[in-house]
Swiss-Prot record:
<comment type="similarity">
    <text>Belongs to the TRAFAC class translation factor GTPase superfamily. Classic translation factor GTPase family. EF-Tu/EF-1A subfamily.</text>
</comment>
<feature type="binding site">
    <location>
        <begin position="148"/>
        <end position="151"/>
    </location>
    <ligand>
        <name>GTP</name>
    </ligand>
</feature>
<dbReference type="InterPro" id="IPR000795">
    <property type="entry name" value="T_Tr_GTP-bd_dom"/>
</dbReference>
<dbReference type="GO" id="GO:0005525">
    <property type="term" value="F:GTP binding"/>
</dbReference>
<feature type="region of interest" description="G5">
    <location>
        <begin position="187"/>
        <end position="189"/>
    </location>
</feature>
<feature type="binding site">
    <location>
        <position position="21"/>
    </location>
    <ligand>
        <name>Mg(2+)</name>
    </ligand>
</feature>
<dbReference type="Pfam" id="PF00009">
    <property type="entry name" value="GTP_EFTU"/>
</dbReference>
<dbReference type="InterPro" id="IPR027417">
    <property type="entry name" value="P-loop_NTPase"/>
</dbReference>
<feature type="binding site">
    <location>
        <begin position="14"/>
        <end position="21"/>
    </location>
    <ligand>
        <name>GTP</name>
    </ligand>
</feature>
<feature type="region of interest" description="G2">
    <location>
        <begin position="70"/>
        <end position="74"/>
    </location>
</feature>
<dbReference type="InterPro" id="IPR004161">
    <property type="entry name" value="EFTu-like_2"/>
</dbReference>
<dbReference type="GO" id="GO:0003924">
    <property type="term" value="F:GTPase activity"/>
</dbReference>
<dbReference type="GO" id="GO:0003746">
    <property type="term" value="F:translation elongation factor activity"/>
</dbReference>
<dbReference type="InterPro" id="IPR031157">
    <property type="entry name" value="G_TR_CS"/>
</dbReference>
<dbReference type="InterPro" id="IPR004539">
    <property type="entry name" value="Transl_elong_EF1A_euk/arc"/>
</dbReference>
<dbReference type="InterPro" id="IPR054696">
    <property type="entry name" value="GTP-eEF1A_C"/>
</dbReference>
<dbReference type="InterPro" id="IPR009001">
    <property type="entry name" value="Transl_elong_EF1A/Init_IF2_C"/>
</dbReference>
Length: 424
């Protein structure tokens, strides 16, 4: 049963054209997730178009127009099972989607696979650096690096070329804080060293990609942290009373607990808890629950309030410091800009009070202190003041409540995380 194995979200990152989609296609194919007839059909189609080496990549690039252009755009979720884990692959094609999804936590990755091409003239490139730095900044806890396209080195499967690229990867990852990262030679296209050791790489004594994936650590469920449950909705049920609904992000809720909702500042007792219409005595991280609270009226709570223990209330802020990435803004952002911040289930207009500095996406160093404005592509530290009471936590303490998206003009213009705060 898939559901009994721990679940892992895996994000595939790296420079464009270094073989991410081919690797994903290969993994799915090897795990029997793609029927042979589809592979045959793709192969025939690719050959007709003169792209004989694209068969596995085409599994991911399944839209006609993408195939014509040879580009992956859709963010695709694919699943496969190993002996140990149930993986969901978050293919990260469009840089922008990737950053937005990673930051807002819609696809919080438990691990990343960094794909670097071994082909001459490729190796570690601009986007490789940027993706690695973002993975670190956004709290991806573990990383596997793969040196792909080993079949395309001169001569093929060159140990010398592997070592050159391996050194480049180590130089990139060590300063930004990724330690003990396995760096594995393979070929996504030919299938070398994916599931089993390859005679073409007889010099390689380390793990296959599969062994490295199985060696990843299970993401810890944050049960030891204080309870935090962002409210999605509130109902009043005849004969029962007020029933808030939401997903527990951290901690545990038990029947009988004294809880408080912030910023509403309303306290009550948990009388009952239900999940999927089944009563339960306690619920934990990841559980979507409805719970009845005594002592609070329906109209006293709303979406965006956060429930926590009465003796450890969720943090209401007067202002906070954030690291943001500008994803898509038509002009520039200056101090005084007031878009809507989407934090957990809350949506609150916030003013960017001050742009403290911009940051180099390759290594995290300061580019410019107090710039007048920031634009698409910039990473910056900013000071933010919400228009009304807002619960947000430091990403270092409650990552699930510290990430946000910034929306304006009907689109996500930036995303970020709270790195420091001033309590209200």
């Amino acid at each position: 049963m898939a559901s009994e194995k721990p679940h892992m979200n895996l994000v595939i990152i790296g420079h464009v054209d270094h073989g991410k989609s081919t690797l994903v296609g290969r993994l799915l194919f090897e795990h029997g997730e793609i029927p042979q007839h589809i592979i045959d059909e793709y192969k025939k189609e690719a050959e007709e178009k003169g792209k004989a080496t694209f068969e596995f990549a085409w599994v991911m690039d399944r839209f006609k127009e993408e195939r014509e252009r040879g580009v992956t755009i859709d963010l695709t979720h694919r699943k496969f099972e190993t002996d140990k884990y149930y993986f969901t692959i978050i293919d990260a094609p469009g840089h922008r989607d990737f950053v937005k999804n990673m930051i807002t936590g819609t696809s919080q990755a438990d691990a990343a696979v960094l794909v670097v091409s071994a082909r001459e003239g490729e190796g570690v490139m601009a986007q490789t650096k940027e993706h690695a730095f973002l993975a670190r900044t956004l709290g991806v806890p573990q990383l596997i690096a793969v040196v792909n396209k080993m079949d395309a080195t001169q001569p093929p499967y060159s140990e010398k070329r592997f070592n050159e690229v391996k050194d480049e990867i180590t130089k990139l990852l060590t300063p930004i804080g990724f330690k003990n990262v396995p760096i594995i030679p393979l070929s996504g296209y030919k299938g070398d060293n994916i599931m089993k050791p390859s005679p073409n790489l007889s010099w390689w004594k380390g793990p296959t990609l599969m062994e490295a994936l199985n060696a990843l650590q299970v993401p810890a469920k944050p049960v030891d942290k204080p309870l935090r449950l962002p409210v999605e909705d509130v109902y009043s049920i005849t004969g029962i009373g007020t029933v808030p609904v939401g997903r527990i992000e951290t901690g545990v809720m038990k029947v009988g607990d004294k809880v408080i909702f912030m910023p509403a500042n309303k306290a009550g007792d948990v009388k009952s808890i239900e999940m999927h219409h089944e009563p339960m005595q306690q619920a934990g991280p990841g559980d979507n629950i409805g719970f009845n609270v005594r002592g609070i009226a329906k109209n006293e709570l709303k979406r965006g309030d956060v429930c926590g223990p009465a003796n450890n209330p969720p943090t209401v802020v007067k202002g906070f410091t954030a690291q943001i990435v500008v994803l898509n803004h038509p002009s520039v952002i200056a101090a005084g800009y007031k878009p809507v911040f989407h934090v957990h289930t809350a949506q609150v207009a916030c003013r960017i009070d001050e742009i403290v500095k911009t940051i180099n996406p390759k290594d995290g160093t300061t580019l410019k202190e107090k710039p007048d404005f920031i634009k698409t592509g910039d990473i910056a530290i900013v000071k933010v003041v919400p228009d009304r009471a807002l619960v947000i936590e430091k990403v270092s303490e409650f990552p699930q409540l510290g990430r946000f998206a910034i929306r304006d003009m009907g689109m996500t213009v930036a995303a970020g995380q709270c790195i420091d705060l001033e309590k209200a």
